[in-house]
């Protein structure tokens, strides 16, 4: 039992593992140590990046994995044979985002089975992989910018051909509206021959437009007549304008005509007939030739009759 305030002392092997970095001796023990270290490094990366938890991720496990990777990195720095392949500063403090990251694609590790040191050959240095990746990235970046120039040079004539073919199709469908537009667009682009061809096509447009108008007139029904604004005004009469919205079938001022039936109610009533029926109620006789020269008293009387009925 340890007294109060006493410190627990590590054993020799524990002290070496905890406080110091184990310095493996030369020989098979070194090979086994490097293999174990590489295996732990791979497993830690796999758990850190390719971890799909069914429950909530554990912060303690993430911290342990990060500490292990940081320790392996320090060993690699002290050995000086490999460049740091893992930067602890790039790892965010949030463990939730780390656990949901996808694993990077595994790089192929070439292994020489016929060599005398198979374990050493299986462990490919990360520096070589980084150098290879840098070279491939540089070559890809050098190749890709040259591709758009070739594509653009090859696509320009194709676009011109498609534009000209589209113009031809539009001119065939509606030559009257697009003949002038084609002449304006073809003048700055094409030579003088194209402008002369467009000028030749101009007189053909109105003739075809006339034929289209004649066909449209033929397709109209026989009773359809196109009238101008003056003809439309002359065809209408004042009776149609003033008394078009009055239903006179409901107002029968003569009791004898009420028994004539529905035929008499549906008969058209003109303004003169209406004024004749209203004449007995007025003080002065109203002439049929002057229906619109009534006094204000007569208008008031007519409104009273209409409202009362």
UniProtKB/Swiss-Prot annotation:
Question: PROSITE patterns of this UniProt entry?
Answer: SERTA
Question: Which ranges belong to the motif Nuclear export signal (NES)?
Answer: 233-238
Domain named SERTA is located at: 33-80
Show which residues constitute the signal peptide: none
Q: Name any Gene Ontology BP term.
A: positive regulation of DNA-templated transcription
Q: Where is this region: Disordered?
A: 1-30, 79-114, 175-220
Single GO molecular-function term?
Answer: transcription coactivator activity
User: Which cellular component appears as one GO term in the record?
Assistant: nucleus
> Where is composition skewed (Basic and acidic residues) in this entry?
8-18, 204-216
Q: Could you tell me where the Low complexity compositional bias lies?
A: 89-99, 175-189
What is the induction note for this entry?
Up-regulated by high fat diet in adipose tissue.
Its main localization is: nucleus
The yes or no answer to whether the keyword Transcription regulation is present is: yes
User: For the region Required for transactivation activity, what residue ranges are annotated?
Assistant: 230-306
The subcellular localization recorded is: Nucleus; Cytoplasm
Q: In which tissues is it expressed?
A: Expressed in white and brown adipose tissue.
UniProt entry tagged with the keyword Cytoplasm? yes
Could you state what the record's PTM comment says about this protein? Polyubiquitinated, which promotes proteasomal degradation.
Per UniProt, the keywords (alphabetical) are: Cytoplasm, Nucleus, Transcription, Transcription regulation, Ubl conjugation
Q: What happens when the gene is disrupted?
A: Resist development of obesity because of enhanced lipolysis and thermogenesis due, in part, to an increase in brown adipocytes number. On high fat diet (HFD), show reduced white adipose tissue (WAT) weight with smaller adipocyte size, improved glucose tolerance and insulin sensitivity with lower fasting glucose and insulin concentrations. Animals on HFD have higher and lower concentrations of adiponectin and leptin, respectively, compared to wild-type. They don't develop liver steatosis and have 57% less adipose tissue macrophage infiltration.
Assembly information from the UniProt record: Interacts with XPO1; which mediates nuclear export. Interacts with TFDP1; modulates transactivation activity of TFDP1/E2F complexes.
Q: What does this protein do?
A: Acts at E2F-responsive promoters as coregulator to integrate signals provided by PHD- and/or bromodomain-containing transcription factors. May act as coactivator as well as corepressor of E2F1-TFDP1 and E2F4-TFDP1 complexes on E2F consensus binding sites, which would activate or inhibit E2F-target genes expression. Modulates fat storage by down-regulating the expression of key genes involved in adipocyte lipolysis, thermogenesis and oxidative metabolism.
Q: Under what name is this protein listed?
A: SERTA domain-containing protein 2
Species of provenance: Mus musculus (Mouse)
- Name the gene: Sertad2
């Amino acid at each position: 039992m340890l007294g109060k305030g006493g410190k627990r002392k590590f054993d020799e092997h524990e002290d070496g593992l905890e406080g110091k970095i184990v310095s493996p001796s030369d020989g098979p023990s070194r090979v086994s140590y490097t293999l174990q270290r590489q295996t732990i490094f791979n497993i830690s990366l796999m758990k850190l990046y390719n971890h799909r938890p069914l429950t909530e991720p554990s912060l303690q496990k993430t911290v342990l994995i990060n500490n292990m990777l940081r320790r392996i990195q320090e060993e690699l720095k002290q050995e000086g044979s490999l460049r740091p392949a893992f930067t602890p500063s790039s790892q965010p403090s949030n463990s939730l985002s780390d656990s949901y990251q996808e694993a990077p694609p595994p790089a192929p590790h070439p292994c020489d089975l016929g060599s005398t040191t198979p374990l050493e050959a299986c462990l490919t240095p990360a520096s070589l992989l980084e150098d290879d990746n840098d070279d491939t990235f540089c070559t890809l970046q050098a190749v890709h910018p040259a591709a758009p120039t070739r594509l653009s040079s090859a696509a320009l004539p194709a676009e011109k051909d498609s534009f000209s073919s589209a113009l031809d199709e539009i001119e065939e469908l509606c030559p009257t509206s697009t003949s002038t537009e084609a002449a304006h667009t073809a003048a700055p682009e094409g030579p003088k021959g194209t402008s002369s061809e467009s000028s030749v096509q101009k007189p053909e447009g109105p003739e075809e437009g006339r034929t289209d108008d004649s066909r449209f007139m033929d397709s109209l029904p026989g009773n359809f007549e196109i009238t101008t604004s003056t003809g439309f005004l002359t065809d209408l009469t004042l009776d149609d304008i003033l008394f078009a919205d009055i239903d006179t079938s409901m107002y029968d001022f003569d009791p004898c005509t009420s028994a004539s039936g529905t035929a008499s109610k549906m008969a058209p009533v003109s303004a003169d007939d209406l004024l004749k029926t209203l004449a007995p109620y007025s003080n002065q006789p109203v002439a049929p030739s002057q229906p619109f020269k009534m006094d204000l008293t007569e208008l008031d009387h007519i409104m009273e009759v209409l409202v009362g009925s």
